[in-house]
UniProtKB/Swiss-Prot annotation:
Record protein name field: Thymidine kinase
Active site: 88
Gene name for this UniProt entry: tdk
Highest classification ranks of the organism: Bacteria, Pseudomonadati, Pseudomonadota, Gammaproteobacteria, Enterobacterales
Alphabetical list of Pfam families matching this protein: TK
Annotated family: Belongs to the thymidine kinase family.
HAMAP family: Thymidine_kinase
A Gene Ontology cellular-component term: cytosol
Compartments, record wording: Cytoplasm
SUPFAM superfamilies in the record: Glucocorticoid receptor-like (DNA-binding domain) (SSF57716), P-loop containing nucleoside triphosphate hydrolases (SSF52540)
NCBIfam families according to UniProt: PRK04296.1-5
Enzyme class: transferase
Transmembrane segments: none
Catalytic activity: thymidine + ATP = dTMP + ADP + H(+)
Species the sequence originates in: Photorhabdus laumondii subsp. laumondii (strain DSM 15139 / CIP 105565 / TT01)
Length: 201
């Protein structure tokens, strides 16, 4: 019986690398996979999943308006789909999570989702919230803070290198804008940013 998996982490834990390896494993056995990534993520070439170690794969794009369930079923009618892999799944909506649950339950296709658990404020993304609630399997992919502890938070920085603790949830960027840290160093950076803001008023 197919299951819905949520592989989550902070940034730079190898989520895309893990997705690409899983897709390769299916393909090597002659099985067809569908790979999705978020249209909003413009860090790399559009229509591709790219890993920091240089691996890449073509991908179907999704926006918040995409009916992923219908798209998967149409592809499955053309040629059997053995597994669906979704990168940047934190950008999925509640309705889209419901759609992929139905794909798993009624079409018997495993769905592997890879994404961030929380944003730079430490708050859940909508997609992550419902995957944490509804996925059959939750798998944490680990990365480390500069101190060596497990990194479970993401800091966002402004153009001058100062930590930011408010603003829009989505602001696409890479290592120049975000860094994964442990809770202790996240709180220290945020408290310092709040202190500096207060001092400048």
């Amino acid at each position: 019986m197919a299951q819905l998996y949520f592989y989550y982490s902070a940034m730079n834990a190898g989520k895309s690398t893990s997705l690409l390896q899983s897709s390769y494993n299916y393909n090597e056995r002659g099985m067809r996979t569908l790979v999705f990534t978020a249209e909003i993520d413009t860090r790399f070439e559009n229509g591709k999943v790219n890993s920091r170690i240089g691996l890449s794969s073509d991908a179907l794009l999704f926006s918040q308006q995409t009916d992923i369930g219908e798209l998967i079923r149409n592809e499955n009618k053309q040629a059997k789909v053995h597994c669906v892999l979704i990168d940047e799944c934190h950008f999925l909506t509640k309705a889209q999570i419901e759609q992929i649950c139905k794909v798993t339950d009624y079409d018997d296709i495993p769905v592997l989702c890879y994404g961030l658990r929380t944003d730079f404020r430490g708050e859940l993304f909508s997609g992550s919230q419902y995957l944490l609630a509804w996925a059959d399997k939750l798998v944490e992919l680990k990365t480390i803070c500069y101190c060596g502890r497990k990194a479970n938070r993401v800091l966002r920085f402004d153009s001058e290198g100062a930590a930011i603790y408010d603003g829009e949830q989505v602001d696409i960027g890479g290592n120049e804008k975000y860094v994964s840290v442990c809770r202790k160093h996240y709180m220290e950076a945020i408290n310092e940013a709040r202190k500096n803001r207060k001092d400048s008023v």
